[in-house]
A protein has these predicted regions:
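Short N-terminal targeting/anchoring amphipathic segment
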Residues: 90-109, 121-123
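Helix-loop-beta element that forms the nucleotide-linked donor phosphate-binding surface
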Residues: 116-117, 162-163, 175-177
Length: 177
């Protein structure tokens, strides 16, 4: 079985990075599955936690950080341009690898993941409580127009999650809501 994890970057000393790597290592070393971790913004930084030599790490090299140094209009242009590039690159890798299962940590790819026709089962895996996904709570605090954008993205995220084949959440409260 081929399993692909999708994550932004494995470069922070955080629970999500550690959890993803531990699960991937277990699946590769103990369960003898073919495991790939695809990141979008690793930027040649080494992973903080050790990755099994049986795992293939692919960074598709999109620097989403470069959008943050501009005004809202330019930032929007960068975001959609980078998302288009991300979709093309991720689609290429999923069609090349032909995974049986793709596990998303509900990052940017959630916007289009279920639209990719690669034949895989799509699973969402949340490593933070629902109100804090994609830092939308911070945008909501900034006032108009950020609050409207955050509401739109939250609604879009909830619709996308419903299209996944399965969803693993952090808390019982998230499961109930």
């Amino acid at each position: 079985m081929t399993i692909v994890y999708l994550y932004t970057a494995l470069c922070t000393v955080g629970g999500a990075d550690r959890s993803i790597i531990q699960k991937a290592n277990y699946l590769a070393d103990e369960m003898h599955q073919d495991v790939f971790i695809i990141t979008d913004s690793q930027k040649e930084r080494p992973p903080v936690f050790p990755i099994s030599p049986r795992i293939r790490h692919i960074d598709i090299g999109i620097d989403f950080d470069r959008q943050y140094h501009h005004n809202l209009l330019v930032r929007g242009y960068y975001y959609f341009t980078l998302m288009h590039l991300y979709r093309k690159k991720l689609e290429y890798w999923l069609k090349t690898l032909k995974p049986d299962i793709v596990i998303s940590t509900l990052g940017r790819e959630l916007d289009f993941l279920t639209q990719l026709d690669d034949g895989s089962v799509k699973i969402g895996e949340s490593h933070i409580a629902k109100p804090y996904t994609r830092n939308l709570h911070l945008m909501e605090q900034r006032g108009f127009p950020y609050k409207q954008i955050a509401r739109h993205w939250r609604k879009k995220q909830e619709e996308a999650v419903k299209k996944l084949d399965a969803l693993v959440v952090l808390t019982q409260h998230d499961a109930d809501n």
